[in-house]
Regions:
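Non-catalytic interaction-recognition regions
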Residues: 1-247
Length: 247
């Protein structure tokens, strides 16, 4: 309450001074504490405050180690692998912070943050690049039917439950963005994106896309993939989470 009262006075003074244009609304978006594993405020081992540059570098280093364990280093040249590790590490930190209700206190947990499972940045980055890979294969199999370009104009026919669940969730993107703008609570967008990615995983596992027949069904499912890719890309971009070209 003390902080809220302080900022109300600051905004009132700024308005009287003419620094705030008429009709402009200012609000203080209060945030909670970030705790270390010991339950105290996040600090270095020596007890000093954590520097953001050091924290992000450690995130990149940890992401690189996890990607090596997943054999990703063998699939990319060193330059691209370094770019991917940087995107995953920095994206993980950003997403972990924004996915928590901003007034809540949370524990800074590296293992949870850089995990490729659950509501995390790496999971959503992987889901997005996975859809991109579907379109790369679609373009490489032109003889099999419609490719990526056609998916942008194809109609969508709902033929299975997972398709319906995903399509309905995609329809809610606009409302979620409006809610985030009105409340200054980006964790709502994070929760939505996680739901989209989870529903897409179920859809992709249960509904053949590139092998779907007839060609009209293949085009329909590619169109649903395209809309999912658009939603995830927009959401992660708004959150400032980088998306690697491949993972």
């Amino acid at each position: 309450m003390l902080f809220r009262s302080h900022f109300r006075m600051v905004f009132a003074v700024a308005r009287e001074a003419g620094w705030i244009p008429p009709g402009t609304r200012f609000e203080h978006a209060q945030i909670g504490l970030v705790l270390g594993p010991d339950g105290n405020r996040l600090r270095t081992r020596s007890g000093d405050n954590v520097q953001l540059s050091d924290l992000l570098q450690e995130a990149v280093d940890r992401a690189r180690g996890i990607l090596v364990e997943l054999d990703a280093a063998a699939r990319f040249d060193p330059a691209e692998f370094g770019t991917i590790a940087e995107a995953v590490g920095i994206g993980a930190v950003k997403y972990a912070d924004l996915s928590t209700a901003r007034e809540s206190t949370y524990v800074f947990d590296w293992d949870r943050m850089i995990s490729f499972r659950g509501n995390t940045g790496p999971y959503l980055q992987y889901a997005t690049t996975r859809i991109r890979s579907i379109f790369r294969r679609a373009d490489g199999e032109a003889a099999a039917g419609p490719g990526a370009a056609a998916a942008r104009t194809a109609g969508i026919a709902i033929t299975a439950g997972p398709e319906r669940a995903l399509a309905l969730k995609l329809l809610g993107l606009g409302a979620v963005l409006t809610s985030v703008g009105e409340t200054a609570e980006p964790h709502r967008l994070c929760a939505y994106l996680f739901d989209v990615a989870s529903l897409f995983t179920t859809f992709y596992e249960e509904c053949p896309v590139l092998k779907a027949e007839p060609a009209s069904l293949r085009a329909s499912r590619l169109a649903l993939c395209a809309l999912t890719l658009d939603a995830l890309t927009l959401g992660l971009t708004l959150l400032g989470v980088p998306i690697p070209a491949r993972m």
